[in-house]
């Protein structure tokens, strides 16, 4: 059950408890609850709707019990710093953090480091769409790119594209087939770090080139699990059955769950 989120002045923080039937991590007892944090907001996207679509999708497709905390920064300002990130314990207690945000014009090394440190220390992450375009100014911008596993300088025109699976045997993609988005913004990838593994790609109508748009990354000295996708500009794309399954699989993988065993059976 997704709780409707009421209007607040600036920052919205709400915990949503949902039920299913698996364990949060392999080390936890059956029936335990995974704690997930979704951070969203910023420029250029419908984060008001997506803050509900993402948890709903994962809850619909996963057996896992998840307690969601949603932090929504209600601003279109791409240079707005969240006080939340300035607390060194901001990620404490969460099993996985989902970043669906768009704050491109922030370059403060101290601020960026405050976001990266918990992930470098081992907190798993799911990165969606414009998160790959965040924090791309300033002297330490490449540290963010290393976390993402790629550098994306921009995107092409909006158009549907076929998602072509490049790693069908990977746990996340196993059993999935290629699909075509109803609409989309294909991000260009001009650098892939050696820590990332491509899972799927699509062809740009503008350049004719293939660009990775689903991948995993082993971040930092602890090889923290990071699942990332640049797909997800439009709500109708996020609401596709294939997208919802894909984001659930990536979430479960990042959290250290056996993906196939943790998915609900597909409805026939």
Segments and roles (model prediction):
Residues 1-10:
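Bacterial N-terminal signal peptides that target proteins for export
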Residues 11-22:
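Hydrophobic h-region of N-terminal signal peptides that target proteins for export
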Residues 27-33, 49, 60, 92, ...:
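Extracellular ligand-binding/catalytic regions of CAZymes and related secreted enzymes
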Residues 28, 35-39, 46-133:
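Helical hinge/lid and interdomain linker segments adjacent to catalytic or ligand-binding clefts
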Residues 41-44, 102, 157-161, 232-240:
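Active-site rim elements
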Residues 43-44, 104, 132-134, 203-206, ...:
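Short, solvent-exposed loop/turn segments at secondary-structure junctions
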Residues 59, 65-67, 93, 156-226:
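Catalytic beta-strand/loop cores that center a nucleophilic Ser/Cys/Thr
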Residues 104-175:
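A glycine-rich, often tryptophan-bearing local segment used as a flexible ligand/cofactor-contacting loop or short
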